[in-house]
Amino acid sequence: LLINKQKIIRENQKDLKNAIRKNLIDSLVLNEKRIEGIRHSINEICNFKNPIGQILETWKRPNKLNIKKVSTPIGVIGVIYESRPNVTADVAALCLKSGNCSILRGGSEAINSNKILAHLFREALQKNKINKNCVQFINSRDRKIVDNLLSKMNNYIDVIVPRGGKGLISKVQKFSNIHVI
C-alpha cells in the first residue's frame, strides 16, 4: 500500500471527481493518512489469533460420546458495501484470515479506489504464494450484477454480508437466495 499510495490516490481522485452526492466525499477520500490507516488495519487483522480450529464448546452426551464444536471457515462470502474504499481491504483481510474466499462488490461511487485496492491485495497474495483468486472483485457499476449475485449464485456463495444503510440491507434481505448475515 505504501509503495503504491500515489497510484491509490490517483484512482481515488477519479472517484472524487465523479462524485454526484457531495455528502459522500468524506467517506470516499483516500489520502496518505487514510492509506496508513488501511495498512494498520490489515496488520492488526494479520496479528489476530487464528480463528480456524478453535474449540468453542465441548460436552458429553449421556452415552458418553464427547462432542466438540470447532470453528471452521464458512467458504465463499459475498460482501456488498457502499462507498467506503477501506472496506475493500478490511473485508478481504478478514475473510482471508478466517480461511474464507471473498467476492467484493463496493459502491459505484468508489469503483476506481476499490479496484486498485483489490488489485493490490490480490497482487500481495500472489507474491506470498497464496492463490489470488480467493479474493474476487466485481468491477462493474451495473446493478443487475448485484441482482444476479443475490438471486442466482446460491450454489457458489455461502453467505452474503450487506454493509451499508437500511436501503442496501433491506434490498439484500428481500432479494437474496443466499443466507444473509
Spans of features found by a protein language model:
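A glycine-rich helix N-cap at a beta->alpha junction
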Residues: E123-F137, D158
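Catalytic cores of large soluble enzymes that bind and process phosphate-bearing ligands
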Residues: N4, S27-R34, E109, S113, ...
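Conserved NAD(P)+-binding/catalytic subdomain of aldehyde/semialdehyde dehydrogenases
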Residues: V76, F137-I181
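Short alpha-helical
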Residues: K7, N86, N112, K144, ...
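A structured beta-alpha segment of the ubiquitous adenosine-cofactor-binding alpha/beta core
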Residues: N31, E44, P62-K69, Q136-N154
